[in-house]
Amino acid sequence: LSGKTITQVFNATKPHKFTFYNGEPSEYGKLLVGKTILSSEGYGMFVNFNLSDNVIMNIGDGVSVRYYNAGDKIPANYQLLLTFNDDSFLVFTVVMYGFINVYPDSYIDNKYYKLSRESISPLSDKYTEAEFEKLVAEAKKTLSAKALLATNQRIPGVGNGVTQDILFNARINPKQKVLFLSDNQKEVLFNALKETLVDMTFEGGRDTQRDLYGNAGGYKTILSAKTWKNPC
């Protein structure tokens, strides 16, 4: 996408009450048309498209982005669509909920984004067992193992979808309270967290998600919408 200039912005054909924007999405055209994509970068559950003139387009959580070549059929339903100077286009859709934000001055006012920027990625070697122990120690003891991993972006980028397989690999009941996790269970959970996320990343994402070109990830999910009907 780098080097492409935005020529038009089309708003939602199917409004979605759990798609969150900053300001009025009807004003996005004024902010985006004429801007060139310079680069992109990810922080936890967020992705930034860095544009010319210090504009940032920031998407998060359940936003699916799909790139289409010139002449491809335009999907009937979307939450935002951008066309480029080569007539290719980018489509943003939301299934459950997600953020599609545009910031004209590079300042992103979102507490979860700030948390993701300031936290250590669980894929990093710097995310050690000591970091995980600190997270557990600071959590409310009434919190469940699933909530510890999947809520409030305690671990950048980790949400409900990946948590299912992490807990399964750790052999820990999602409802088990943090208070009752033994030292051995904490160690096993930490290792499952690291190893499961590495596997998902190495395989190009989960098979329930698609990349920019519509290709499904290569990681075969253990627990997901694809597998819930299957026997254990």
Identify the function of each model-found stretch.
Residues 98-140:
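A short, charged helix-loop
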Residues 7-27, 41, 46, 133, ...:
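Basic, nucleic-acid-binding surfaces and adjacent catalytic neighborhoods in DNA/RNA-processing proteins
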Residues 61, 65, 113, 118-121, ...:
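Flexible, active-site-adjacent loop/turn segments at secondary-structure boundaries
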Residues 86-93, 117-125, 144-152:
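Short, mixed-charge, low-aromatic patches
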Residues 72-76, 126, 139, 156:
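Short, amphipathic alpha-helical segments
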Residues 1-114:
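Acidic, proline/glycine-enriched N-terminal capping motif
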